[in-house]
UniProtKB/Swiss-Prot annotation:
This is Purine nucleoside phosphorylase DeoD-type. The lineage of its organism: Bacteria, Pseudomonadati, Pseudomonadota, Gammaproteobacteria, Alteromonadales. Homohexamer; trimer of homodimers. It catalyses: a purine D-ribonucleoside + phosphate = a purine nucleobase + alpha-D-ribose 1-phosphate; a purine 2'-deoxy-D-ribonucleoside + phosphate = a purine nucleobase + 2-deoxy-alpha-D-ribose 1-phosphate. Phosphate binds at residues 21, 25, 44, 88-91. InterPro entries: DeoD-type, Nucleoside_phosphorylase_CS, Nucleoside_phosphorylase_d, Nucleoside_phosphorylase_sf. It is an enzyme of class 2 (transferase). The keyword Glycosyltransferase applies. GO terms for biological process: purine nucleoside catabolic process.
């Protein structure tokens, strides 16, 4: 039944949900990759769709920006709609020289400056990591499709406009691949409910070089990431 933030009926979500931050990216995926896609929720214009990809039933829904927003939607999907797997597909800022604009980054784990997982985990640090089976499937699919990917630790930030840019040098030293704003929250919710989660990202900005993509490009052109993720769930 509908929740405070999702109006879909029971059974309208597939067991696998792809979750971009931007609801218009969810619409783009539904319009361009899914067959027989149906809009099943649009509360607060957070669009969600269910359709099929090569015969596989799949849903896609926006999460909004930041840990609090994705935590709300992931909780309701896992707890109230029986969703088993959520794969965040989004954008990130690279912090290493060997990672370029439009490269694909897969978040094996997510460090963070957010406090939400400490609140969940009795005020001690929780190692927020992806589900191995989802991770392996995406990496194997990337190899099969000949798509190069970077796999490793990412950083989930609470602030987009950080007052502490010196943190990026520390991230690079410790092998962080890129910065985004949701993965650690998603991984924490998945762990809380015994479900599966993964994050697959396209580099939209490079923190060191200042290169960036436009908002229109972020909405519609990251097709390698979308295709890779959909192929991995077949």
């Amino acid at each position: 039944m509908p929740t405070p933030h999702i109006e879909a009926q029971d059974g309208e979500f597939a067991e696998t949900v792809l979750m971009p931050g931007d609801p218009l990216r969810a619409k783009f995926i539904a319009d361009n990759f899914l067959d027989d896609a149906k809009c099943i929720t649009q509360v607060r214009n957070m669009l969600g769709y269910t359709g099929t990809y090569k015969g596989k039933r799949v849903s896609v829904m926006g999460s909004g920006m930041g840990v609090p927003s994705i935590s709300i939607y992931a909780t309701e999907l896992y707890k109230d709609y029986g969703v088993e797997k959520i794969i965040r597909i989004g954008s990130c800022g690279a912090v290493r020289d060997d990672i370029k604009i439009r490269d694909i980054v897969i978040g094996m784990a997510a460090s963070t400056d957010s406090n939400v997982n400490r609140q969940r985990f009795h005020n001690v640090d929780f190692a927020a990591c992806a589900d191995f089976s989802l991770l392996k499937s995406v990496v194997d699919t990337a190899e099969k499709l000949g798509k190069p990917v970077h796999v490793g630790n990412i950083f989930t930030a609470d602030l987009f406009y950080t007052p502490q840019p010196e943190k990026f040098a520390t991230m690079e030293k410790y092998g962080i691949l890129a910065v985004e704003m949701e993965a650690a929250g998603l991984y924490g919710v998945a762990a809380e409910y015994g479900k599966k989660a993964l994050t697959v990202l396209t580099v939209s900005d490079h923190i060191k070089t200042g290169e960036k993509t436009t908002s229109e490009e972020r909405e519609t052109t990251f097709k390698d990431m979308m295709e890779l993720t959909l192929e991995s769930v077949l």
